[in-house]
Amino acid sequence: ASAAVSVSPATGLADGATVTVSASGFATSTSATALQCAILADGRGACNVAEFHDFSLSGGEGTTSVVVRRSFTGYVMPDGPEVGAVDCDTAPGGCEIVVGGNTGEYGNAAISFG
């Protein structure tokens, strides 16, 4: 099974809200990192590296919490340049929570603000 990510709540979010991120189907990963990213016009993710959460996976599953921001300073992942302020309301692809496993597996789930 491929990696899956769910976020609760995922819509109508307030700036600074805490969401619960659940990951499953991470077949080979034992730990993961969750963070918020905005999707740029070219399809790259510009992520909020200031607020990321490492968590452990057991049987390919795990849960963590992430604080979400309507706007933040985005960095192209995994080690790319700072792209400046990004806003989830105006980002071409909106925003999502991305979970990356320690073996390169990843999944994502869209979020939106109220």
UniProtKB/Swiss-Prot annotation:
Protein name: Apokedarcidin
UniProt note: domains: This protein consists of an immunoglobulin-like seven-stranded antiparallel beta-barrel domain linked to a subdomain composed of two beta-hairpin ribbons.
Entries under InterPro entries matching the protein: Neocarzinostatin-like, Neocarzinostatin_fam
Organism: Actinomycete sp. (strain L585-6 / ATCC 53650)
MF (Gene Ontology): DNA binding
Cross-referenced Gene3D superfamilies: Neocarzinostatin-like
Its biological purpose: Binds non-covalently to an enediyne chromophore which is the cytotoxic and mutagenic component of the antibiotic. The chromophore cleaves duplex DNA site-specifically in a single-stranded manner. The apoprotein cleaves proteins selectively, in particular highly basic histones, with H1 proteins being cleaved the more readily.
Family (UniProt): Belongs to the neocarzinostatin family.
Disulfide bond annotation, renumbered to this chain: 37-47, 88-95
Entry keywords, A to Z: Antibiotic, Antimicrobial, Disulfide bond, DNA-binding
Pfam families: Neocarzinostat (PF00960)
GO BP of this protein: defense response to bacterium
